[in-house]
């Protein structure tokens, strides 16, 4: 398949850097999970070491690792505190022995040992001191490390007036943010409980007395009342357990302002994402009153099951995560529109795993049925379709980058145009891929894949960071006006009829 002249590749590339490491808690015996800890045995051995050996070993460790972390001594102390309950209360440890104890419960994790891929991009919240005609951006990306565990990292840079892309240098010390309790949304609880078959009288007894958005303290107060009435509500303990499991999916993360954005790492906090946070799709969302915030959906993976989560941030310093549920959000790939449409939130979805659709909601946490607007049509998309991030608003309509999978499991990027007022209507589409892996891009962790989780418009320039073979990141640009001009309405009458039939079915179910 020929390269599409609409897309121009940049010479800017991002490769995985195995030296990007964080120091994590390590507990012997629990490396693979499910096994019993050997922590007590390790503690006893540390306590029994001669003081001279302790000093010598600690000195060597600090010499080797201090340059790799901003404050390795503080990390050792934190990890020692985590296992201090295994110490004899009468034990009087020297500072050196305390730090060696912490070091024995610490290991390095290389965030990008396997890959960097699947980026999304938004305008930076700080556009001060930017050269004339340029804009500053924030790019999120998926880092894949040992055990194929994924995290979310960030890069910043500039797009010049001519579309030239420049990346800012990265600071050397990746940092995981501090987790805190999150806020909960009542509609999300109802939706999750309904899916479990547990949204009955007792659930209503808890939730109906809570505000639309509530805290963990407010939830626990209601659950205590429920449990106190277990003699008349025999499912009280079960309902309380379900509420707490849902609450565990909402949390906050905060970074110190002194930590550069290129050092901030969103790392799994809850059990539902223990094996990774994948494919964040960020968008700068604007309300009707002009206020803005950054939103993103991402896929939480526990090693077996996947679910969708929502991120919110105003500044990329503090983040709030909460679950996303509903018929239109069963697996992955929800991408939010950058504003409300007819008073409702809107999102792209691939709820059936192979077609593109739009859904609407009064809230960001619960999405009902979706309306299909695109079925696989061309030979390069016969296996499945999906979106590549949030739509971009143009005068002609919503510009949507899509991905398609064709023969030889080849991933390519396409584009469609949706109606501004009714995005369930597809106005036009590219007949050929906008971007497909070049010969130089075919090889990698997953061959023949190009994929993005979002693009931005800078004037008439469409800026597309994209993952290559699930291993590295490249950039491409395209003229938006030329892209729109190259689109055509679908030419297959049978496909047109199928889409219209599917759309009418979806609309009937919606109402």
Where are these regions (language model features)?
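Donor nucleotide-activated moiety binding/catalytic core segment of transferases
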Residues: 380-388, 448-451
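Short glycine-rich loop/turn motifs
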Residues: 278-279, 307-308, 388
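A conserved acidic, glycine/proline-rich C-terminal tail/linker
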Residues: 441-455
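Beta-rich carbohydrate-recognition and catalytic domains
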Residues: 1-275, 284-334, 339-383, 393-445, ...
């Amino acid at each position: 398949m020929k390269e599409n002249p609409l897309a121009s590749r940049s010479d800017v590339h991002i490769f995985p850097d195995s030296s990007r490491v964080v120091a994590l808690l390590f507990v012997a015996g629990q490396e693979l999970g499910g096994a019993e800890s050997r922590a007590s045995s390790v503690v006893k051995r540390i306590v029994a070491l001669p003081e001279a050996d302790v000093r010598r070993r600690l000195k060597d460790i600090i010499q080797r690792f201090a340059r790799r972390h901003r404050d390795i001594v503080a990390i050792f102390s934190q990890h020692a505190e985590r296992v201090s309950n295994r110490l004899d209360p009468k034990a009087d440890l020297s500072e050196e022995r305390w730090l060696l104890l912490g070091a024995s419960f610490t290991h390095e994790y290389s965030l990008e040992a396997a890959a960097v891929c699947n980026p999304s991009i938004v305008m930076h919240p700080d556009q001060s001191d930017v050269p004339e005609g340029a804009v500053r951006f924030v790019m999120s990306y998926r880092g894949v490390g040992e055990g194929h565990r994924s995290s979310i990292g960030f890069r910043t840079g500039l797009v010049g007036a001519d579309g030239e892309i420049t990346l800012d240098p990265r600071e050397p010390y990746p940092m995981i943010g501090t987790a805190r309790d999150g806020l909960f949304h009542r509609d999300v609880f109802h939706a999750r409980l309904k899916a479990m078959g547990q949204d009955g009288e007792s659930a209503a007894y808890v939730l109906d007395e809570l505000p639309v958005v509530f805290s963990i303290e407010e939830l626990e107060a209601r659950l205590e009342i429920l449990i106190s009435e277990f003699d008349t509500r025999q499912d009280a303990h079960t309902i309380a357990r379900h509420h707490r499991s849902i609450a565990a999916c909402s949390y906050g993360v905060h970074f110190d302002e002194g930590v550069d954005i290129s050092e901030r790492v969103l790392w799994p906090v809850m059990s539902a994402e223990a094996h990774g946070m994948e494919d964040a799709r960020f968008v700068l969302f604007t309300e009707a009153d002009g206020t803005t915030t950054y939103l993103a959906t991402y896929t939480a993976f526990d090693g077996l099951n996947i679910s969708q989560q929502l991120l919110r941030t105003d500044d990329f310093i503090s983040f709030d995560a909460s679950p996303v549920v509903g018929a239109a959000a069963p697996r992955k790939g929800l991408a939010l529109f950058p504003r409300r449409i007819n008073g409702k939130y809107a999102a792209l979805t691939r709820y059936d795993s192979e077609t593109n659709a739009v859904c609407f909601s009064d809230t960001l946490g619960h999405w009902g049925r979706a309306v299909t607007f695109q079925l696989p049509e061309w030979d390069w998309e016969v296996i499945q379709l999906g979106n590549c991030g949030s739509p971009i608003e143009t005068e002609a309509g919503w510009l949507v980058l899509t991905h398609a999978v064709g023969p030889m499991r080849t991933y390519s990027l396409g584009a469609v145009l949706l109606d501004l007022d009714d995005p369930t209507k597809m106005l036009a589409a590219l007949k050929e891929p906008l971007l497909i892996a070049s010969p130089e891009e075919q090889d990698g962790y997953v061959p023949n894949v190009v994929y993005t989780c979002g693009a931005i418009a800078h004037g008439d320039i469409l800026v597309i960071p994209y993952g290559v073979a699930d291993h590295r990141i490249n950039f491409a640009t395209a003229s938006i006006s030329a892209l729109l001009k190259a689109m055509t309405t679908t030419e297959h009458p049978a496909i047109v009829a199928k889409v219209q039939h599917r759309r009418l079915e979806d609309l009937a179910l919606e109402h």
